[in-house]
Every structure is written in C-alpha cells, then in structure tokens.
C-alpha cells in the first residue's frame, strides 16, 4: 500500500519510459508486417486484373499499392525515431547517474575538508618528521657505540694475538693466562740459543722493546 504513494525516482520514470518505447516499437513492427502482407495481396490482385484486361481496376489497385508502400516507409521512419528516443533516454540515465556520483563525491570531500584542519595537519607532519629525526639520531648513536665496543674488543684480541706470536717466536711458551707465564728474564733464551735458531740480537732487542721489556 505504501508503494502506491511512494514518490517515483528518476530511475523509475526512465524505466517506465523505456517500457513504453519498447511497446511502441513492437506495435510498429506488427503494423509493418500487416502492411507487407496487404502489399503482397494487392500485387497479386493487380496481376490478376491485368490478365483479364481490366485497366481501370488495375489503376485503382495501383494507387492503393502506392499509398500502402508510403505508409510502410513511414513505419521505418517512426521506428528509427523510437530507437533514437530510447538511446537518448539511456544516455540521459547514464548522465544523471554520473551527476549523482559526482554530487556524492563532492559532499564527501566537503565533509572531509570540514573535519581536516590544515594547520593541525601541518603541525602533525612536522612533529612526525622531528620525532623521526630523533629516532634516527638515537639509532645512529647506538650503532656507533656498539661499533666502538666491538672494534675495541677486536683490537684487543688482535693485539693479544700479536703478543703471543712474538713471544712464541722468541721462545717463550705461553700456557694459560699471561700471569702464569714465566718471567721475561727466565723465559728469554740466551744469545747463543737465539742465534742457533737464526734470530739476531737486533731482532730480539726489537721484539723485547715491542713488549715493553728494557
């Protein structure tokens, strides 16, 4: 019951118009078919009268045939017009839908613009950039500190390896920690022993100086 008093939308009106146009097109097609049938009958009647030599009857029937063919031609023109109207209706419907979509989009954009504060948005972006820079600086400082720690550890290990290598070259055996190593005086081989191993006095002296032994 409520649908009887419901206001028709544009889509409803266009749908009804298209329905009427389709009905009109079908009626024109039926009318043309009837005219074509009548046209054939007139042609047969004219031929029949011509065979009997009835010229007056042939003349009257020929005039009727001419009028009938003109009417058939008019049906094609009307049918073309109806098709054009149907196409225009579809185009109008599409345009109205696009206009409605644009209107909805405009309202949405307007609502978003009302909610958005350009100054506040700019401030938010600036704060984000500032905090991002702080985070990057903190991350860089942490990385630098870790690099220093690992570099120092690697330098210490490398230095210890060099010391062990030098001590081994001059004949001091390393077992356990450095604190348990024999003293430099006891552990150092004699000059003759060093020479027997092919190490010169200058080389021993240089290596001792490198170890801080005077």
Curated annotation (Swiss-Prot):
Pfam families: Snf7. It comes from the Eukaryota. The gene is chmp2b-b. The lineage of its organism: Eukaryota, Metazoa, Chordata, Craniata, Vertebrata. Probable core component of the endosomal sorting required for transport complex III (ESCRT-III) which is involved in multivesicular bodies (MVBs) formation and sorting of endosomal cargo proteins into MVBs. MVBs contain intraluminal vesicles (ILVs) that are generated by invagination and scission from the limiting membrane of the endosome and mostly are delivered to lysosomes enabling degradation of membrane proteins, such as stimulated growth factor receptors, lysosomal enzymes and lipids. This is Charged multivesicular body protein 2b-B. One of its GO terms (biological process) is endosome transport via multivesicular body sorting pathway. It is a peripheral membrane protein. Belongs to the SNF7 family. A motif (MIT-interacting motif) lies at residues 202-212.
């Amino acid at each position: 019951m409520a649908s009887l008093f419901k206001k028709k939308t544009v889509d409803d009106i266009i749908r009804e118009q298209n329905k009427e146009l389709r009905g009109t097109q079908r009626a024109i097609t039926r009318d043309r078919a009837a005219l074509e049938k009548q046209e054939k009958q007139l042609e047969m009647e004219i031929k029949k009268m011509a065979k009997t030599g009835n010229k007056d009857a042939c003349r009257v029937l020929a005039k009727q045939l001419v009028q009938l063919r003109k009417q058939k031609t008019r049906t094609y023109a009307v049918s073309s017009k109806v098709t054009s109207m149907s196409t225009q209706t579809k185009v109008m419907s599409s345009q109205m839908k696009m206009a409605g979509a644009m209107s909805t989009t405009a309202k949405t954009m307007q609502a978003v613009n009302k909610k958005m504060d350009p100054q506040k948005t700019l401030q938010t972006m600036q704060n984000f950039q500032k905090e991002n820079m702080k985070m990057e600086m903190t991350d860089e400082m942490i990385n630098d500190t870790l690099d220093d720690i690992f570099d120092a550890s690697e330098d210490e290990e490398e230095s210890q390896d060099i010391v062990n290598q030098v001590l081994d070259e001059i004949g001091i055996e390393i077992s356990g920690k450095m604190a348990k190593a024999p003293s430099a005086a006891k552990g150092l081989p004699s000059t003759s022993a060093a020479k027997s191993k092919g190490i010169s006095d200058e080389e021993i002296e240089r290596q001792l100086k490198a170890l801080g032994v005077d």
